[in-house]
Amino acid sequence: MSNEFNAQSFLRTVSSSAGVYRMYDVKNDVIYVGKAKDLKKRLTSYFRKNLANVKTQALVSHIHHIDVTLTHSETDALLLENDYIKQYMPKYNVLLRDDKSYPYILLSQHEHPRLAYHRGPQREKGHYFGPYPNGGAVRESLHLMQKLFPIRQCDDLYYKSRSRPCLQYQLSRCSAPCVGKVSNADYDEQVKLASLFLKGKDQQVISALVDKMELAAERQAYEQAARFRDQIMALRKVAEQQEVSNNKGDMDVIGVHYSSGIACFHLLFIREGKIFGSRSYYPSVPAQTDMDEVLRSFILQFYLNADIQRTIPKEVVISHNFEELHELEAAVSEALDKKFSIKTNVRADRASFLRLAVTNATNAVVTRLSHKNTVEQRFVLLEEILELSTPIQRMECFDISHTMGESTVASCVVFNREGPHKGEYRRYNIEGITPGDDYAAMKQAVSRRFDKIEAGGKIPDILFIDGGLGQLRIAQKIVDEKFVHLDKAPQLIGVAKGEGRKPGLETLILGDTETSFSLEGDSPALHLIQHIRDESHRFAITGHRNRRQKTRNTSTLESIPGIGPKRRKALLQHLGGLQEVKGASVAELVKVPGISIEMAQTIHDALRG
């Protein structure tokens, strides 16, 4: 424990009331936040002799001072604890790093409503269905909806600009309300059915369609009856593929597995008795954290995270019981102002769902441990080959991508001992160089990466340069200049392509000595280097292609007299893209806001000329 902190003196001032405590280190950073029904009793437990828990020993050794906030009740303490954890992200707390908003399907409020992918604030009027566990689940659902219900999925600007049906009409995936190919009544009927389907009321939709099919057959409208028949068959096929519970309510089912420092919470989102989607969460868990704290922290942070727009069910089923379960129920209910119950001992359908969630959580942890061990072994071998005295904690790799010097982009990807650390990836748009000059591009990228680098900054142990000796020398020179005032600098290694660019034949070059060496093609250390090199290449080329496409779209239209950024944006949005603008007639161009007949003729002539 720090000599500057007098535990006995501090404990004499602590109240026995409920409240929250914040522990700080010598840098005045919050390292742990906790709550207690009796603050004096709880805080005293940290300073007993012979602490058994290794995590607690490490925590106490870093305490410089402690702040205490009293609360009216234990429920208030729970809520305040969650707020502080989210604010400070303390290193010794269990942290759920998942602030991404959840995706939804939007059924817009419009004369002819559209189905659309939506993520973020729900500003547009309409009905939002979800949440879905990820974007892929939404896109898959929208693709399915196109086959089942001929409702438009285009944006309103594209819808307004149509003078003839688009390809989706030809594929029977849209009824083309934009050009009057369907009556408003028939379109509204399909919208109602789609809404019921998204609410999980499959059988109600099928029953309604059966009635319509029989009515059409009685009227001898056999073509219409056949369309309803095909729609019914498609819906029945989908319904058969979905696992359905007799319980038609909404609930989240959480399977938990915690092993070797890795915790996985696998959630099944059950809506209207069906598995609406699933998702695994891996909170950051400090070593030696007990299971009760992991469970409590996850539930509290997951269901009280205001940054995540989520429809929270009244019932949560979880695989493990824990000490403060009822206090958590009360805290979440109070915070959300709605009934919220947590169940652990369940039977029938709930038990079946829970077994599935636990199996998924267990498999996920086993897979992660296997991957972690593999990556760890590769790091250890690389350390041995490079004869390093300290473990590698962070590696970075630079690559350059362009097409004949056009739209040059540099990438910097980051690996830690668990593999790719994608939140740290960076791209650099390269400007002001001779097109195609890879040396100048590398110089600019590395300079920007380490500009104003300080001792406390994120300094890689190894910096790979995807290229030969020339690019490596450029990067080494920049690093020498930028790190001259620091005690630590990264070890640079060039990764030169082998004969015929075949994997396994790479030549590695040390930046400081320019010594070259190769590794066996089956070396796990080489596989690690290839992985970071390939990831850097992928990230660079993706950024380059996006930039190139944007540049070409911009330059093609803005080279036309009178077309600036606003008109270019209006043209692309209304007509759906550059190719559609090129293929548009003068009459279609005039329909775009801000485009006169003279301007439309100018655009038409310029793009067709």
Curated annotation (Swiss-Prot):
According to the UniProt record, one GO cellular component term is: cytoplasm
One GO term in the molecular function aspect is: excinuclease ABC activity
UVR domain ranges (all copies):
203-238
Q: What is its main location?
A: cytoplasm
The entry's keywords: Cytoplasm, DNA damage, DNA excision, DNA repair, Excision nuclease, SOS response
Keyword set includes Cell membrane: no
Domain GIY-YIG stretches: 16-94
Gene Ontology biological-process annotations: nucleotide-excision repair; SOS response
Q: Where in the cell is it found?
A: Cytoplasm
Q: How does it assemble?
A: Interacts with UvrB in an incision complex.
Function field: The UvrABC repair system catalyzes the recognition and processing of DNA lesions. UvrC both incises the 5' and 3' sides of the lesion. The N-terminal half is responsible for the 3' incision and the C-terminal half is responsible for the 5' incision.
Family, per entry: Belongs to the UvrC family.
Protein's recorded name = UvrABC system protein C
